Amino acid sequence: DQLPAHEQAFLDGPVEELLKMADGYELSRTRKLPDDVFKFMADNGFFAMQIAKEYGGMPMSTQAKSCIMAKVSSYSGLLSAMVVIPNSLGAAELLGHYGTDEQKNYYLPKLAKGEFIPCFGLTEPTAGSDAASLKAEGVVFKDDDGEVKFKLNFRKRYITLAPVANLISLAVRLHDPENLLGKGEEPGITVVLIEKGAPGTEGLHIGDHHQPIGEHFPNGPIVGRDVIVAADKVRGGVEYT
């Protein structure tokens, strides 16, 4: 089936221009996206294909996204990761479906403009597709002001975009010994949003690049020791714990 005119125009216009701007060899050699290329991507909606227009997005059909990703992926693994993750495993889609109004209004416009670069922290040394085996832990507690927070300890690896990300969607198993959330002592696995550099994240460390299958795209480990986040950083709010 043919794409709608506006989607075909994006494929024939900005996508082709992006591939002309970026030097595939230099991207592979340096493992870095030049500032002008990143700005072009942000200005032209490459990070916004999974976000509704009301939040500054540029929603695309599944067919169009597939065509765009296939073309970009045929040129560069780094460019591919920068397009694919924000429009699939990034925070945008699940926030759009399940986020609170406050989360949508705060995160989605920044994701659409590339101010937040997302990654999804699931894979661990002993857990990947078997997500139920993850060992990342979050302990629910009240701070000195009585605010409910989580203390997170985790070791993730092979996380695509981790070396360049500043917004982590972290899969973690919660323990609530005082039943502060009202869901028992073991609420289970949830996803918590962590902003790099936010107060309480001093124990967050993003390591060097991995090189999966020899490709030089941003992929690396994330380690957290006593990282503190508020309970409202659960994607979708505390009811999704």
Description of each model-found segment:
Residues 1-86, 93, 97-117, 129, ...:
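Amphipathic, small/basic residue-rich leader segments at the start of a protein or domain
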